[in-house]
């Protein structure tokens, strides 16, 4: 028996329930550079002090359980426990508060988003002492960031691969998303790419259904890519969705895409899971494939204001797990988001260092230590008349993705793609000439109509 164990065992063991705050509420604690920091929005049951509930969150997401156990004496709780180190009220919400929790780095497996989330959010959200709980933000320490590969390639490498600079990239989701045969699907891909788009996209629920098996879709889309490249002289791509029922099948589809010579594949990272996503990201880096990420199912997790997890946390997790693009909301269009809040997590995706800024929803300063950036994808419900606002809001390092805004053109798919490309280039040219896109956007688009269907 080690001296450490002998000493602790000699103190004795007293069973029973004790208040969490006696062990896990430590307002005097000074956070370490190696701690993972979390900001939780807590809505407690009536009559429970904030200190007790904040401590309960720290305990139940780290080393604690509902009672004292004798094996507590066999380890160092001071080394491994989570600590609620600060509590602040939520303006305008009398019953809510923000609990800040620090987790020692030793609690987490290196390079595993799966393990990080299992610890921090895996159990505590069902805690009956809380009416609701929402994870607003995480600070990932440099020491932990460096255990992740991150995106397969990143923004600059993608631009170099595509030879496209100085403007946002243009995409289109093929519609109807379900029911087309592989050949008709490939025809729509060709028409959009030939018209001037950089990418087309499988919808998130296009996998390998009876009406269109994945291998047939991959072959017809590859034919469309090569034909449009030959005719336009530009590099083109289609987000071939490799998401599958097993990791093995997913990798098999990615291997086939690589053998076809296409530049990019796609994954539904929340429904597919972080373990699968990280595996695919590693394969993509090793084999020169870009990786487009769809966030299908995100609203189940992030839509409720008081419960769940904010998308900025899912965005940080995606940058760690790996993806070159991720859908981020539009600020305009069918799925609007608060502008400042959206741009806050867009910066967390793209930039190397982001300062704390509560007005933009950024609770912690985040240093990514040169982890490659991720291109935000603005999509759903947008069209050419949104182009000035999108160009101004998202800047060059983004993907602007029009589904119905391309395929819904009265003259067909190719004219719809031409209209998008002309509108984008008109907005970029006007911006570079110093014109105000917010004030003159409508006029700029009307001028561009002279040269576009």
Swiss-Prot record:
UniProt subcellular location: Plastid, Chloroplast
Entry annotation: catalytic residues: 175, 294
EC number from the UniProt entry: 4.1.1.39
Domain of life: Eukaryota
Annotated residues for binding of substrate: 123, 173, 177, 295, 327, 379
Residues where N-acetylproline is found: 3
Propeptide: 1-2
GO biological process: photorespiration; reductive pentose-phosphate cycle
Modified sites of kind N6-carboxylysine: 201
Subunit field text: Heterohexadecamer of 8 large chains and 8 small chains; disulfide-linked. The disulfide link is formed within the large subunit homodimers.
Additional note from the record: The basic functional RuBisCO is composed of a large chain homodimer in a 'head-to-tail' conformation. In form I RuBisCO this homodimer is arranged in a barrel-like tetramer with the small subunits forming a tetrameric 'cap' on each end of the 'barrel'.
Protein known as: Ribulose bisphosphate carboxylase large chain
Lineage of producing organism: Eukaryota, Viridiplantae, Streptophyta, Embryophyta, Tracheophyta
